[in-house]
Amino acid sequence: MQCIFIILNYNDSQTTINLVDKLLHYSSVEKIIILDNKSPDNSFKVLKNYYNTMVKVVLLQSPKNGGYSYGNNIGINYVLNHNFNSECVVISNPDIFIAEQDLNGIIHVLDADKTIGVVAPMMKIAGADTFKISAWRHPCYLYDCFSSVPFFRRWADKFICYDKSLFIQPIMRVDVLPGSFLAIQKQVLQRGIKFDDRFFLFCEERIICEKIRNLEYKVVLSTLFSYDHYESISIKKSYSRATARQRLLNDSKKKYYKLYRSKNHIRNFLLFLLMDFNFFLMQLRGLFK
């Protein structure tokens, strides 16, 4: 049993190299596809020189930086247009590490149950034994409202977080998995499931997981296995200011509600107003730092 890795790089060649150099030694990895998202920092040249002679690595470059969904879709299209043996396709951030035994376990979960469309391991904070939120319920309107208000943000997590008692299950059926590591059945991708490249960054997980569930595949978290996540290194390198990341999040949420959710313009107006007010407060706080 093997898998194919798709790793999206943007202005972060060293983090990508750190991950790929480890994956090269895993017998369970058939091919590693690195998609450079038109990095302006010479990443593509660095990666090309570094992996030029390695047949296990395919290096692609997108014609533009279209964001997470756009870049990963190029990698998915490459997989579907080539005759690879693997039935498991892993969409991975470069700022993660997964041990080979954990990766093998995830591949086995998919291979053992073809009704599972996508699976992810538990997500740990790198260098610690602390787990991050590894899965959540599909965000509802109230969650998106309350999470837009700083005072209510932690309380709002109650709308989407699963009870800790559920995590004793080795295979836990969930709504949404984080986009930092998604192991997807190739047959799901062959049925036309891809990321919505109208979204530059954020909300991509809730959209693709919902698409997979709508095809009556299961979205599951495997609690027996884990991976380390280095606290969004890649995103923070590209968007160092919190206000820049918040602007992207707000833009994606607004687009999500316009395209996928309520057509109630009053509800949407109230949500968008909360998001814009929170963004204004963030900018105001930044002026006094």
Regions found by a protein language model. Name each.
Residues 85-97:
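Short beta-strand-to-loop acidic/aromatic patch adjacent to the donor-nucleotide binding site
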Residues 62-82:
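Glycine-rich, basic loop-to-helix element that forms the pyrophosphate-binding segment
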Residues 12-25:
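Short, well-formed alpha-helical segments that are part of the catalytic scaffolds
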Residues 167-169, 173-226:
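A short, conserved alpha-helix in the catalytic core of glycosyltransferases
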Residues 240-289:
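Non-catalytic, C-terminal membrane-associated alpha-helical segments of glycosyltransferases
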Residues 138-174:
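Short, flexible, basic/aromatic active-site loop/helix in glycosyltransferases
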Residues 97-134:
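Conserved donor NDP-sugar-binding/catalytic core segment of glycosyltransferases
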Residues 22, 36-45, 64:
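A conserved acidic beta->alpha catalytic loop
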